[in-house]
Amino acid sequence: ERIKSGVLPLDLYQLGSLKFLAPDLDKFACLKLARYAARLGTGACIALNTANEIAVEAFLAEKICLTDIAVIVKACLDDKTIAQDYSQDFGDEVLGLERILTMDKKVRKIATAKIKLLKQGGVL
């Protein structure tokens, strides 16, 4: 459903041209983490996605600040018990659903614990 905003639809032909600049990776920490995970491979991308889901959920529930999302995601990517799962070279192997769900469950548990620690004033 779309809300009527009174604004005309975007017409790219009428706009003419767009200019894209390199993103500031210090300001956009989650983009930096996504690029890092992409370099590491499939398992790291699964870990990043799961940690992000949990962190965003906590933010929307007002349990953490917006800037804590990147902190939680990075802490999960740096966590040794998660890293051992994604540090394996999967190469071109397509991960099965069972393997993905196992990783997802593990990251959810760790991300939730890290959020709890952060809320208690702990350092990640």
Which residue ranges define each predicted feature?
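Catalytic, metal-anchored helix/loop core of enzyme active sites in primary metabolism
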Residues: 1-124
